[in-house]
Regions:
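Metal-cofactor-binding active-site regions of metalloenzymes
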Residues: 1-837
Length: 837
């Protein structure tokens, strides 16, 4: 389906809606004939496609549009290749999973365009009854219809799937709920697109440099007007009662009030139906749901069924050749879909850009529109807690959410979520459904005198130590006196790793672990997002090691993502052209860690490589620490001390080799690195922090020798509190990557995986999320297959891993789909010799 995918992406995502004419035009496109110039211009953005090939693609597209109901026939044709209706459900129609590669093609198409239009098209072509329609439209995704998967996916009485990495606010149908809200409140005067500072559709931005937020808002007004007009037509509203609508003039903001009044009129009719059915009055969510209200009002999916029903009715009118849907209405629906997909591409990750920052932009927009409307916000939890569990056999669901400022506020919020899901209390939820609190990482904002790195976040987490102690106390009381099962079962971190090392959270993790252990709160467990986003593979591995040691993760903890463990080092550094650009500080830390970790774990480094790394380290150390005594020089000068003598004293204090220990400079620096889990303020004085200073996990155990060493303490103090060290350390350097260094990195990966296996620390893998963010481009290259790759790779391990979704609303996936994706990818994969595995 590569050809179909390319054509549909061009016709639905790359064509501007202004270039589609409602009336017949020789120069513009319509639903059954796209202009050649427009098509070829859009096709230039296709990877690995020459101009002649694009011409062929255009000819194929034109033939496809002519032999069917234009673009709508093309959509149906793709839907029929992968979907079927069976047993009252929409199912994947894959007859031979071991030979048929259609599923992975479908995954690419549905990631780009979603599944809603394809499900609506195949339904419209089958024209089911009203009761069946409501069931079909409530399905968040097609069902897997393959007997061999029944046991794996927990069907027919088998144990279900565990969802161990599930961000609550990133897992609802992000676009559909926001779009429904927008189409029903377009005229309310809210700044719906306040976070849309930049467009994610890069190719469109290049082509239309004058685009701005007003453009995307204006197109939304047009879509809302098109939607209402088409709704009135297929609903049979007499023309004299329809909202005034002209095919011959542009819609503008002057029409907004009239448009919103009419929308509210139809929503009001929905509210009357609710009043009649339930004896109470609530706001209608979507006027387009009108005909299905009596069979959908009590469904968890009621908030998004209206838009799906609208799509279904339009497709049905076209396929059934409804005379009310003329040429003009078909073009109007095409224009609507173009705007629909244009805005969808700004809320669901569809672009090919990798890295966590790209994903984070989408993540930050996920509630931009519904933020203004509490009645839609409460359906986020219903969609996540009820709908997704209803359509998948999930045995346990760990829902991650960010805590509020205080423990009482957090508990109150959780109780509200439980009520929104439709449960009366925690007793009914049992052990299979609970919350994990995740704390967002934050980059440091700059250097502040006498403040450590990331001081703002450190101060927040210091306050959270007390709040989470109180939360544990509250849950213990509920369990002891009321028998209520604790709702918060674990702690995690989230958001981007770059610029926020595990050391920032170390004190919090140690303090809460100790408190939970003292109070026998054995339901509290630990995980940490790490090794997902990194500027160098070695940097990602060091972060994993820092998490293990600084946070002192206990047995049966987990790491979120951990991709650095299993990434193919050769392919990674080849992709980077064998050059790494990092700050001096990070490079210095990485080299010292590579040397120190290898020494401690018996990994032999070739003499030539060892010399290369030590020489590079010495250069960095001199540039950042030895030569950076200007601020000390000024301080000593002001106090009347001889400047040269002062410089010599400070340099000796900071970087001199402790001859009594006969250690090299990198060894002392590596020992100082081990102190980074300690509370930085304890090192402001030159005195050694004593064990009596340990409070709330301020000092970690097992590193007393490094703590005693004056040179190590000076390194650590300068790392945090020396302005010149931090400024010089931020300067960027290029490291050339050698073949023997790559081989060393592979050994470091293997050793770390072995350590985690022995410690029984598992990895929460997220196939689609990792594929979108990580540095690999095929699912069979997923790092999990080295973490647990029995009979697959020479250097694979037997770690505890789980498959999860991460942010399924942004990545357009499901837990079943993640399992099937990896299954099919493995069936299609080849070994180094090109043979099937």
């Amino acid at each position: 389906m590569d050809i179909e995918k390319a054509v549909l992406e061009i016709l639905l995502r790359k064509i501007r809606y202004e270039r589609v004419s409602i009336h017949f035009s020789d120069t513009l496109s319509d639903y059954r004939d796209v202009s050649k110039r427009c098509f070829l211009q859009a096709a230039r953005n296709l990877a690995d496609s020459a101009e002649d090939e694009n011409e062929q693609l255009y000819n194929w597209a034109r033939e496809a549009l002519e032999r069917q109901e234009g673009i709508y026939g093309c959509i149906l044709e793709v839907a029929q290749k992968i979907l079927k209706i069976k047993g009252g459900y929409i199912c994947y129609d894959i007859r031979n999973w071991s030979e048929d590669s259609q599923f992975l093609h479908w995954k690419e198409i549905s990631s780009s365009l979603g599944q809603d239009i394809f499900m609506a098209a195949i339904l419209a072509n089958n024209n089911p009854g009203k009761e069946e329609i409501s069931t079909y439209l409530c399905m968040p995704f097609p069902k897997i219809d393959f007997e061999d998967f029944d046991k794996l996916l927990g069907k027919d009485g088998h144990v279900g799937l565990a969802e161990n990495h599930f961000h609550l606010k990133g897992s609802f149908p992000v676009f559909m709920l926001n779009w429904t809200c927008l189409m029903n409140h377009i005229g309310d005067g809210n700044d719906f697109f306040h976070r849309f500072k930049e467009y994610r559709e890069v190719e469109i931005l290049i082509e239309h440099e004058d685009m701005n937020r007003n453009d995307i808002f204006y197109s939304s007004i047009c879509a809302a007007a098109y939607r209402l007009h088409l709704y009135e037509i297929y609903s049979g509203v007499p023309q004299e009662l329809q909202m005034p609508f002209s095919y011959d003039r542009d819609i503008d903001e002057v029409d907004l009030r009239v448009l919103q009044d009419r929308i509210e009129y139809y929503r009001g009719q929905l509210e009357e139906k609710w009043d009649y059915a339930k004896g109470q009055r609530e706001k209608g969510l979507d006027y387009a749901l009108a005909e299905l209200w009596d069979v959908c009002y009590d469904k968890a999916e009621v908030s998004i069924v209206g838009e799906r029903y609208f799509l279904y009715r339009c497709f049905n009118a076209i396929f059934e050749k409804d005379t009310r849907f003329r040429y003009e209405e078909k073009n109007l629906f095409y224009k609507y879909l173009l705007i629909f997909f244009r805005i969808r591409s700004e809320m669901v990750q569809t672009n090919p850009m990798r890295g966590f920052k790209n994903f984070q932009i989408y993540q930050d927009r996920k509630e931009d529109i519904i933020d203004y409307y509490p009645e839609y916000q409460k359906h986020v939890i219903r969609l996540v807690g009820c709908s997704l569990r209803r359509w998948q056999n999930i045995s346990t669901l760990e829902m991650r959410l960010s805590p509020k400022t205080t423990a009482d506020e957090t508990i109150s919020r959780i109780k509200e979520f439980d009520r929104d899901i439709g449960k009366s209390g925690s007793e009914e939820l049992g052990n299979d459904y609970f919350y994990v609190l995740h704390f967002p990482k934050e980059k440091e904002t700059g250097i502040v005198e006498l403040k450590p790195r990331n001081y703002i976040l450190r101060e927040k987490m210091a306050k959270q130590i007390e709040e989470q102690k109180r939360l544990i106390d509250l849950e213990m009381n509920d369990l002891k006196y009321w028998g209520r099962i604790p709702r918060v079962r674990g702690y995690d971190t989230c958001s981007g790793e770059i610029g926020c090392r595990p050391e920032v959270f170390a004190q919090f993790y140690r303090a809460i672990q100790a408190y939970a252990k003292r109070n026998q709160a054995n339901w509290v467990h630990w995980t940490y997002h790490v090794g997902e986003d990194f500027l160098d593979l070695t940097d990602g591995l060091r972060a994993i090691d820092e998490t293990i040691h600084f946070c002192e993760l206990p047995q049966n903890s987990r790491l979120g993502h951990g991709m650095a463990l299993g990434i193919n080092a050769k392919k990674y550094y080849k992709m980077k052209n064998y050059k790494i650009l990092l700050s001096r500080q990070d490079l210095m830390d990485n080299i010292a860690w590579v040397l120190g970790f290898s020494s401690e774990h018996g990994i032999v480094i070739p003499v030539d490589l060892s010399g290369y790394l030590k020489k590079y380290f010495s250069k960095l150390l001199k540039n950042v620490y030895v030569d950076n005594v200007k601020e000390y020089k000024k301080e000593e000068s002001d106090s009347g001390v001889d400047q040269e003598q002062a410089i010599a004293q400070v340099a000796a204090t900071i970087v001199s080799i402790d001859l009594s220990e006969e250690k090299e400079e990198w060894q002392l620096y590596y020992d100082a690195w081990k102190l980074r889990g300690d509370r930085p303020e304890l090192y402001l004085e030159d005195e050694q922090p004593e064990m009596s200073d340990i409070y709330d996990g301020a000092l970690r155990g097992g590193i007393e020798e490094a703590r005693k060493n004056k040179t190590c303490r000076a390194y650590y103090k300068s790392y945090h509190f020396s302005n010149s060290v931090r400024e010089k350390g931020a300067i960027l350097e290029i490291l050339d990557i050698r073949d023997d260094y790559i081989e060393l990195v592979q050994k470091l990966q293997e050793e770390l995986m072995g350590i985690l296996t022995v410690k029984q620390i598992g990895i929460e893998c997220n196939p689609t999320s990792n594929f979108k963010i990580g540095p690999f481009n095929r699912f069979e290259q997923h790092p999990m297959l080295r973490m647990y790759g029995k009979n697959l790779y020479k250097y694979s391990n037997r770690m505890n891993i789980s498959i999860n979704t991460d942010d399924m609303g942004i990545f357009q996936t499901s837990l079943e789909m993640e399992y099937v994706t990896m299954y099919v990818a493995l069936l299609k994969s080849k070994d180094e010799n090109g043979k099937a595995r």
